Amino acid sequence: MIPRYSRPEMVALWAPQTRFRIWFEIEAYACDAMAEIGIIPKESARAIWEKAGNVTFDVERIDEIERVTKHDVIAFLTHLAEFIGPDSRFVHQGMTSSDVLDTCLAVQLQRASDILIADVDALLAALKRRAYEYKLTPTIGRSHGIHAEPVTFGLKLALAHAEFARARARLVAAREEISTCAISGAVGTFANIDPRVEEHVAAKLGLKVEPISTQVIPRDRHAAFFGTLGVVASSIERLSIEIRHMQRTEVLEAEEFFSEGQKGSSAMPHKRNPVLTENLTGLARMVRSAVTPAMENVALWHERDISHSSVERMIAPDSTITLDFALARMAGVIDKLVVYPENMRKNLDRLGGLIHSQRVLLALTQKGASREDAYAWVQRNAMPVWRGGGDFLALLKADPDVSRTLTAAELGDLFDLGYHFKRVDVIFERVFGGA
């Protein structure tokens, strides 16, 4: 992933030095277990840690060896032997490359999950704070992009909070599923390695053992992981699009913070564009682009082929780095979002009271009118107002069918905006609990 959409902690997780350090730990913990079982000398296991436990691996040297071997794990083991010496013969005993690669990937995805969960927590905190700030701020709810009935801006933010709370739960579940270790040998039968080695390495790295593997950990786990990232990205996009629509000039109910000295256009000095949320919409597409190849990786040949490898070398760092950046950016957008309650109220009033049509319909039916008649009476008064003529309440009061069913006072009461917000506390209690 390019630096523009990257943050240091997640980038460092995917750096070669980090990967080689995890590879070493897998090999060294395996040697510890083999020493305890009596397969290799205990002094050799200690020597491996003493001679290579704190070294900085020479990435260029490993690349140089790989140009000859055409095999990354062998290149690493060759370089490792340059530090360890004769005891290196006990490293990787009974193991296959995928034991190292898959277990390392599990560690990296587990750690990436921890970063992403922390990102979601920061976003949840921002959403909660702003939701309470605008808990009772009236705004128009839209269906199909068209004015429907009043909501509050706080409810919009509470909705996003509930969605990202689900995202957090999915990430926790994905972390759990991906956190598996497989050190079972060439085809998963433990023919040349004791299962206790796998158990020891898994415990040391905070993983579970894979119940049954082939040469690799089954890729349905990875498909579920990247699918989860795709869903989280889609939630980011949904919230981004909501903000982008609200920032449109003719709406302008909210907008991204526009900093001192910021420019919106090279040609038009007046422009204030929703560039952050537009950017987030694009980044969400990139995260989702990892989902299909991750699904296709599930169907490997027999006990394993290598078709998944090139895919994962790209999508694992790219999707986690991108989602980390996107979540942090979204938290910043919400934290600094500029809200215009006066424009929300202005937009609420644009349709001359039509947003109360359902209340009138229901009141008429409760007074004895059939639903079909009531709907026709309300609609015939609504359409002229929709076309820009007249006031809805005034037209209803003048309608003979409506006026003989409802008094003018009763009609007036139906246009009370506060009626729509009487359950806001209930909804907030459901979303946020007693907080």
Language model: regions and residue ranges:
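A helix-coil-helix interface module used to build multimeric assemblies
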Residues: 1-184, 190, 194-200, 209, ...
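Short amphipathic alpha-helical segments with heptad-repeat character
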Residues: 110-121, 128, 158-161, 165, ...
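Long, amphipathic alpha-helical stalk/connector segments used for oligomerization, subunit docking
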Residues: 286-369, 377
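C-terminal alpha-helical interaction appendages
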Residues: 336-405, 421, 426-433
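Residue-level signal for inorganic ion chemistry
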Residues: 38, 280, 323, 374
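Glycine-rich cofactor-pocket loops
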Residues: 132-154, 253-271, 302-311, 335-355
